[in-house]
Amino acid sequence: MELDVLGLFGACSYALDCVEAELVHVTTFHAKRVAYMSVCTAEQFGVSGEALQDLAVCALLHDNALTQYLHEEFRGDSSAAECLPELPHLGAHCVMGEENISALPFHTDVEHIILYHHENADGSGPFGKTWQEIPLGARIIRLCDLLDAFCRADIFTPDVWERANAFLTRVRGRIVDE
């Protein structure tokens, strides 16, 4: 029997969308957008083949432990999800997420991609890592995660790309690469 790994991870992403819908009563398809943007960005850096496939999977599953974290942090009180942007220790879901994917059958080394996907270029992220200490995959997912949050559909306006470009210019060197 042959395992369709991409199909499996697509199904996992769908399951995460369902959990998101249950928690915050809306499905945003955030993981799918981040995965798509991550693949497009990684290709510009010359990433291809199995490494690109593994990055796509990591991007799909980058927030795989977010609901687990919320459940543990708030003892199952899903109404706490409303305060998500203000959670002080959101990096904990990165640790849980890294553990969750550790036994998955990746083709390449994906260690620390999930763990460091909220790190900032200047070391101000949850683990204090600077850009040179963070795998390229995690840096790409960080950038695409920020862009998706910035350009999400509920705040979409015709000038969204100009605002996104201005945002990236403001945070260059602090949050993302120069």
Predicted segment positions?
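Histidine- and acidic-residue-rich, metal-dependent catalytic cores
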Residues: 2-178
